[in-house]
Regions:
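Oxidative protein folding and maturation machinery
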Residues: 1-95, 101
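A structural signal for short secondary-structure junctions
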Residues: 19-20, 99-100, 130-133, 157-158, ...
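Conserved segment of the thioredoxin-like fold in thiol-based oxidoreductases
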Residues: 73, 128-172, 180-181
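Conserved redox-active cysteine motifs that mediate thiol-disulfide chemistry
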Residues: 100, 108-125, 142
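Alpha/beta-hydrolase fold active-site loops
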Residues: 103-104, 188
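Conserved hydrophobic packing residues within short motifs/helices of P-loop NTPase cores
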Residues: 106, 138-140, 191
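Solvent-exposed loop/turn segments at secondary-structure junctions
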Residues: 110-114, 144-146, 170, 207
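Thiol/disulfide oxidoreductase modules built on the thioredoxin-like
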Residues: 160, 169-216
């Protein structure tokens, strides 16, 4: 993604002039903000934009976008986010067995999924309930390996307290077969496992509908 943004920026620099160049470059920053990609390459390109267009009317919006990008990329991983080593895991069960004897709320997501990110705004009550009732919050990302760093930063940026696993090749297809349909997986997808490691809800309620989700978690705990 970084190379794509850089190529686009320098293509605009060489191919366009004046207001057209200025607007095209500014859109790169605004699209990054709007789509929450937070491409780190844009941080250095911001300096280039300022040199080329120091009086640009786009500057307030570009500065805001760059500020959000920088905040994301400078996010530290807090102690309450855990990334267990699952490199040897062959199945989903190998992962859930790490939390034997506990109810598990699994959130299947990806960094590129807008609805997944939007749902994170509603996780407060779920986090409080999980802490009080020893429920494991397991965030299962279907991101590709090349997005590993972004995946970790995004988990921290959104304050996703809990366990974080990125799908491994060994059980990638199993995730799609188990929770998808005809080879496609719609995310976000929420799954609840009981204390015996059995799936109780293959399509649990979103944290946005907390009262209903709480009932499902309580049922899984019986």
């Amino acid at each position: 993604m970084e190379k794509g943004v850089e190529l686009a920026f320098y293509d605009f620099e060489h191919r366009l002039t004046g207001k057209a160049q200025e607007a095209a470059m500014a859109q790169l920053f605004l699209e990054d903000e709007g789509q929450q990609r937070y491409d780190p390459a844009l941080l250095s390109l911001a300096d280039e934009f300022c040199k080329l267009h120091p009086e640009s009317p786009w500057m307030p919006w570009v500065s805001r976008a760059v500020g959000k990008n920088r905040a994301f990329n400078e996010t530290a991983i807090p102690a309450d986010l855990h990334f267990p080593d699952v490199s040897s895991a062959q199945t989903i069960k190998d992962v859930t067995d790490l939390y034997k004897g506990k109810v598990i709320f699994m959130d299947i997501w990806a960094t590129w999924c807008g609805p997944c990110r939007a749902a994170f705004a509603h996780i407060g009550p779920l986090q409080e309930y999980a802490a009080a009732n020893d429920v494991v919050l397991l965030y299962l990302s279907i991101d590709r390996p090349e997005n590993d760093e972004k995946w970790r930063k995004m988990a921290a940026y959104y304050g996703l307290k809990g366990e974080h696993v990125r799908v491994q090749n060994a059980f990638h297809q199993e995730v799609y077969d188990t929770f998808g349909r005809q080879g496609a997986l719609s995310i976000p997808r929420y799954v609840i496992f009981d204390k015996q490691g059995r799936i109780r809800f293959t399509s649990a309620t979103s944290p946005e509908q907390w009262d209903k989700l709480k009932e499902q978690l309580q049922e899984a705990d019986r």
